[in-house]
């Protein structure tokens, strides 16, 4: 199923503009025509790989994100499936990723970076208190608005202590430059793994490169 601008999803969400595309799927800026508000729509790609495995992962992302109500976590509004394609309807965050900010500016003064890190840590604390481990904390998944508000995004490889294991034992999950030593060894991630990754993010922002 090819997604195009103007297409209506679930008779409610209009696709306005593709924001990103990867191996797992596409992310669109959309519009909720019932509530008249912008939304972000993450759609599974059905033309590559094991579609059922991807759907299983997307369902897990929806499950893990559903109850994480916090100002520093991008909210999930709805999950919908049609013709073997899954759609995550999420809060639209008009902002730049911390990765974009690092790329444009190199380093940030501690007085500017610290509030970003604090907000990210608060969001992670809420996720951890619900038994959810992000497992892919990195600048690209930390959105920062023009007012300095932070939203953690993309729980696509997250793990919940209340769900069945999706990844195989020994499988490395996350982005290599930011994952904790235990993740790099294929061991189970813990809340401390996310904090380690946030430490790498902090180091990069202060020094201009990763440790």
What is each residue range found by the language model?
Residues 15-22, 27:
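Protein kinase glycine-rich loop
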Residues 43-67:
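AlphaC helix of the eukaryotic protein kinase fold
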Residues 79:
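Activation-segment/catalytic-loop signature of the eukaryotic protein kinase fold
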Residues 83-97, 101:
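Conserved short submotifs of the Hanks-type protein kinase catalytic core
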Residues 116-117:
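Activation segment signature within eukaryotic-like protein kinase domains
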Residues 120-132:
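Protein kinase catalytic-loop region centered on the HRD/HxD motif
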Residues 194:
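Conserved catalytic-loop aspartate of Hanks-type protein kinases
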């Amino acid at each position: 199923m090819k997604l195009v601008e103007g297409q209506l999803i679930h008779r409610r969400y209009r696709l306005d503009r593709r924001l990103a595309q990867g191996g797992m799927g596409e992310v669109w800026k959309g519009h909720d025509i019932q509530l008249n508000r912008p939304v972000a729509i993450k759609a599974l790609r059905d033309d590559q790989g094991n579609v059922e495995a991807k759907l299983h992962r997307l369902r897990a992302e929806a499950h893990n994100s559903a109850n994480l109500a916090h100002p520093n976590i991008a909210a999930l509004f709805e999950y919908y499936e049609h013709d073997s394609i899954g759609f995550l309807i999420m809060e639209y965050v008009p902002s730049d990723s911390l990765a974009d900010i690092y790329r444009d500016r190199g380093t940030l003064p501690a007085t500017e970076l610290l509030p970003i890190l604090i907000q990210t840590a608060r969001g992670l604390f809420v996720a951890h208190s619900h038994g959810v481990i992000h497992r892919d904390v990195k600048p690209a998944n930390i959105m920062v608005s023009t007012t300095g508000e932070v939203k953690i995004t993309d729980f696509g490889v997250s793990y919940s202590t209340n769900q069945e294991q999706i990844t195989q034992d020994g499988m490395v999950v996350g982005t290599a430059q930011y994952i904790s030593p235990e993740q790099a060894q294929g061991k189970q991630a813990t809340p401390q793994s996310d904090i380690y990754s946030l430490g790498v993010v902090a180091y990069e922002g202060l020094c201009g490169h990763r440790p």
